[in-house]
């Protein structure tokens, strides 16, 4: 996916860009920053990790993992909608509440991409190496943003990113989980 993003930049004749990546997008942005730093002017890494499977970093919250397991079983029973809604509700944090209509809209957006979305997403993350020991090589101004209640990417991942990238700043959003609701747009963009 990093190669796809770089190919798109080349096609659009974008020589240098500010990269913003959330979750897996943050892993993609790190990959680009490490492999082609000359095309990156700055980074914003949101709710992401330098190595989701790195043993030196905290694992996802067991309650969230239980929800993912239950969701996987629901998907096997061909109930992807209920599975996604359950996972989403487990990952939002306590600062904001979501009504079922908003969650339903999000499901419809994801569902438009096909039934194997979660499987492909998980496979891609599984194949991404840990960048924890390479963060020092990122010499690009970076903003790291994470929720204090992210059950998938615990807060120590954000601290690791911020401490590993010398030109970085960390912004922690209190009470926010892995999902970034619309109400945070102004806070994040400022």
Question: How would you label these PLM feature ranges?
Answer:
Residues 1-17:
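Conserved acidic catalytic loop of the alpha/beta-hydrolase fold
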Residues 17, 21-23, 147:
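Conserved alpha/beta-hydrolase "nucleophile elbow" surrounding the catalytic nucleophile
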Residues 26-37, 43:
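Short glycine-enriched nucleophile-adjacent loop
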Residues 41-75:
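Flexible "cap/lid" loop of the alpha/beta hydrolase fold
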Residues 63-133, 140:
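Alpha/beta-hydrolase
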Residues 138, 144-146, 150:
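Short beta-strand/loop motif that positions the catalytic acidic residue
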Residues 149-153, 178:
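Acidic catalytic loop of the alpha/beta-hydrolase fold
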Residues 167-190:
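Catalytic active-site module of serine/aspartate enzymes centered on a nucleophile-bearing elbow/loop
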